[in-house]
Amino acid sequence: MKNRTAMYDFTIIVPVYNEEDNIQAIEQQLAGYLPHALRPACVLFVNDGSTDKSLSLIEEVCRRRPDFLYITLARNGGLSAAIKAGIDVTQSPLVGYMDADLQTTAEDFNLLLRDIDDHSLVTGIRANRKDTGFKRLQSKIANGFRRMMTHDGAEDTGCPLKVLHTSYAKRMPFFTGMHRFLPALILLQNGTFRQVPVRHFPRTAGVSKYHLWNRLVSPFIDCLAYRWMKKRYINYSIAGSNLNER
């Protein structure tokens, strides 16, 4: 059964977990972007089991803005689960996502959309990151280890601004932490990706949901899971069939 995302070319997934202080700003930014998006676009909030007022605020936004949609998960499953849930229900040809912390801007989706016809995935690279030096160091170490383990060549998989062809996104094997491996998972499907510099801003409201464990230690464990999965990944293409013959 088709849903309202099928009416658009591009669905922007916004995972939300306890971001009540940011919902109004997210609405304003995305509402300002949609009229001049390079592709007809909608917004899909994924409420990841928030325990604050995020869900009620999202429902209010979606009631007054027809291009804003939402799903809500029964419990908090983490960023990868929220992204997967959004991709699973998306029926537009293109899908992307951004974080609810507004450290990236929706305006930069147009930088990614310019190249999406030529690639399976276009991902941002955070230029002039506004995080603390300790956070940048953690990301540098985690990205270096991931590149060594995956050989994907991606510089900044933690950048929360990405656009994919939905057909590729739906075929990707998902696991906890998979959002760190999108370029590698695209390469497993014989796809291609491009990296584009995007702007980065300091967080102005709410609190980070990440700490030393899930910014540094968890990615190391996820790399081992990826290597195990890669050895067992099944990739095929159908050369012919009679499914459509009468």
Predicted regions located by residue number:
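Residues that recognize and position ribonucleotide moieties
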Residues: 88, 135, 162, 179-180, ...
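Structured catalytic core of nucleotide-sugar glycosyltransferases
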Residues: 1-131, 167, 193-194, 240-246
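Hydrophobic helical membrane-anchoring modules
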Residues: 1-8, 144, 151-152, 175-246
